[in-house]
Design a protein with these regions (language model features):
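Residue-level signature of catalytic and energy-coupling elements of molecular machines
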Residues: 6, 39, 81, 100, ...
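N-terminal phosphate/diphosphate-binding loop that engages ATP/GTP or pyrophosphate donors
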Residues: 20-80
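Conserved catalytic-core segment of NTP-binding enzymes
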Residues: 23, 106-116, 121-212
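Conserved helicase/translocase P-loop NTPase motor core
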Residues: 95-106
Length: 280
């Protein structure tokens, strides 16, 4: 299960990783578990997959059953699908994730034969539905995606906290490592990974060509391409890295990775009094 802040590059990294794995002869299933349903867009050249939840609703109204052909699509050996979620303001995204996995089980999820199943999860939301793979030991490894900015590392740290909590409750899921995306060389993401005791699986540079090709829905993780070694390395590391129990940071520890001028870390908390609140 791959977690990260929205916009951190999870879908970009996963689309290229899954493509490279498939080209290496692995059977790969990529499942988008983000209500935005955009995990597979890069893989399919910008085209949107019909989501499992939306398709299920339409089929139910028509008195029909969902079949795998309705929701799973493939490109060059990568199988991919989107769970989907409710429309804005019309339901619970976390509950949608739970419902989506229930539908996957009806479709035979546990009987499918894949070498890797990659789950793309939004990390900003802390509700139980999005933590399902961690809470129920549904995945073998968690990977976090982040950059050299406080907000993406805040989300990565929260994911590490969730993993640590469920490990303390007897769970088995661990963090295999971190993908550093848009790496500008400032080093905060690497410092974070070291502090929480997880390895860096890959550092994808902040590069204009990568940004442009990603924006144009082009896969760069193709064997023989300029960026192929990056994703070949990532595929190897994802396969080999053992799930580890992280040591998440407290808020002050996270802020200490950055200079106070960048984060406002030198601001002091001054308690308010009742007189202050009343304007006295």
């Amino acid at each position: 299960a791959i977690y990260g802040k929205g916009g951190s590059g999870k879908s970009f990294a996963l689309s290229n990783l899954s493509y490279m794995m498939a080209q290496q002869g692995k059977r790969v299933l990529l499942i988008g578990c983000d209500p935005k349903s955009d995990t597979t867009s890069l893989l399919f050249g910008g085209k949107a997959c019909p989501t499992i939840i939306e398709t299920s609703s339409k089929k139910k109204l028509a008195g029909e059953e969902v079949s795998i052909e309705d929701v799973c699509f493939q490109r060059d050996g990568v199988f991919a699908m989107e769970l989907g979620g409710p429309e804005v303001g019309r339901g619970c995204g976390g509950r949608g994730i739970i419902h989506g996995f229930e539908l996957l089980e009806k479709l035979g999820f546990h009987e499918w034969g894949f070498d890797y199943v990659l789950l793309d999860f939004l990390g900003d939301v802390v509700c139980g539905g999005f933590g399902l793979p961690i809470a129920r030991d549904m995945c073998q490894k968690v990977i976090v995606v982040g950059s050299n900015d406080l907000q993406s590392l805040y989300v990565a740290n929260n994911v590490c906290k969730a993993v640590e909590y469920f490990r303390s409750m007897g769970g088995n899921v661990g963090v295999a490592g971190m993908i550093v995306n848009k790496d500008d060389g400032t080093g905060e993401a690497q410092a974070f990974a070291k502090a929480v005791d997880i390895p860096v699986l890959c550092a994808i540079p902040a590069n204009e060509e990568i940004r442009r090709k990603s924006a144009n829905y082009q896969i760069i993780g193709k064997p023989g391409g300029e960026w192929a070694p990056l994703f070949e390395e990532l595929a190897i590391n994802v396969a080999k890295a053992p799930p580890q129990r992280p040591t998440p940071l407290e808020q002050d520890g996270l802020l200490d990775l950055f200079s106070p001028e960048e984060t406002g870390g030198n601001v002091q908390l001054i308690p308010a009094s009742q007189a202050d609140m009343r304007g006295g």
